[in-house]
Amino acid sequence: RDCLLSRGLGDVYKRQVSNWAKPGGQCRHNLIYWRNQQWWGAGPGAHSFIGAERFFNVKRPETYAHLLADGALPIQDREAITDEEAHTEAVMLGLRLKEGIPAAWVGAGAQDVVDRHVRAGLLEQSDRLRLTDSGRLLADGIITDILAAE
């Protein structure tokens, strides 16, 4: 952050733990993944997340084309996502974003852990739970602590 400020880039903000962007310059495509929203991937090797299922297409273009020509879906493998997995991913991915997550997403059993990280200056809590600039440096550990306490 100091490097950005020293170069006159104070309007750049860390939109996600590992990415920086100017306001309005966020990659909307990647935000779909980080917000755990659904997407449909088209083409050989493409991945999709629809409903409570992830799947990916065959990788070889020839096989992909033959399957489509035969009227078959070119899906190579599927993975059903349980409610628990969906919750874990929503918390894990959402806390990595600047906007954070609704505080209600965190189970009551984790409130002591949240309070400890708030007191340490690593989290901000209101109706949303967000990592502070200091907390972003320790994001994986904080998220692991919260999820383990739920």
Task: For each feature predicted by the language model, list its residue ranges.
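Conserved S-adenosyl-L-methionine
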Residues: 15-19
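Short, electropositive alpha-helical surface patch
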Residues: 20-36
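Short, glycine-/Ser/Thr-/acidic-enriched flexible segments
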Residues: 22, 47, 136
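Short, amphipathic alpha-helical interaction segments positioned at domain boundaries
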Residues: 136-150
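Hydrophobic, secondary-structure "cap" segments at the distal end of domains
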Residues: 31-34, 38-118, 128
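Short, Lys/Arg-rich nucleic-acid/phosphate-binding segment
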Residues: 20, 128-129
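Single conserved hydrophobic/aromatic residue that forms the stacking wall/gate
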Residues: 2-13
